[in-house]
């Protein structure tokens, strides 16, 4: 099936009992066992099946199958938020004493997790620019457990050369984890460029309407965990789960299996089935919405780029952008709908611009059907110091726009009057 069809049909074909066409909401905590042996087999991972909604749920399962199909993966795991998905993905491969290498241009919450929370737990995170493959490679050592990046950076708008990054990481036997939230599988499928694991904030474009928080991890099933000395957690017995060896018990699904039964089970960041249902509704129209998002964003970027009050515009759809050529290869020249710009009067002008907006909403979400604006230095990246913000690709004058699917004339009209107010 094509991606547009997978978004509507993958993972579900009428309820077997009621023949209902809509995916049911299984609002339950638990599932009964046929007998004692059935329960034991489920807990020993000898048989697939439902145990407890903190670990799995039939509504969530449909969403997981659908997202996995769209990304071209073998399986997915849905979680309570995108940050939960990123945290669990790292915890699946790394522990105290290990390190990961990350592209520095990151969403503020991820940067904070990497710069402060993980180091407090004994996991070191080393960063370099996504534009400098050699610098990233120099950070890898025997204790490196993953290389992390965002396919399209938020809010920096950088587009990462996933093929070059993956080739370099695999040369050292390191898996690549890609946050594909901004691009979505409609614009970019990281597995096709060599990535091993994908994470999503489903809250954004996949949900699409600013109603529901959720996250997902998708496993390509291609990374060689078995007999890999860098990853004993996958090829040696796990004492916390009756000595199971994930690479043997789960084969190519070793990563996503361990993610489910270790960080999700033990940390508890489960996605509620009602949220899964809401996210499924958004997912069905992803392709249609992304076409409009990208079309509108390109026109807004071109408008801003020609405006006398604007000092710079960062959108990889503009030919003078340094990531334009990479965007042609990674996202077929459609770099989603997050753009940033600066006003010649600096941070003060940016604040006046945001305060003057009437149609565009002032808030920190992205990927909504509605157009949104924020000032990252005082919101999403506020916890970062000046050097950290610079590393993450955020300047004090940066205004981030998440362009929605309204008529583009109305979006530009609101930007025009707000710029006039910012003089």
Please report, for each region that a protein language model flagged, where it lies by residue:
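Active-site beta-loop-alpha junctions enriched in small/polar residues
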Residues: 152, 181-183, 318, 344, ...
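Conserved PLP-enzyme active-site core in the AAT-like
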Residues: 7-16, 76-306
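N-terminal "arm"/small-domain region of PLP-dependent enzymes with the aminotransferase-like
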Residues: 1-57, 65-66
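Glycine-centered tight turns that cap/initiate beta-strands
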Residues: 72, 143, 309-312, 359, ...
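PLP-dependent enzyme catalytic core of the Aspartate aminotransferase-like
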Residues: 115, 124-125, 142, 289, ...
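Conserved N-terminal alpha-helix of the aminotransferase class I/II PLP-enzyme fold
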Residues: 35-87, 109-117
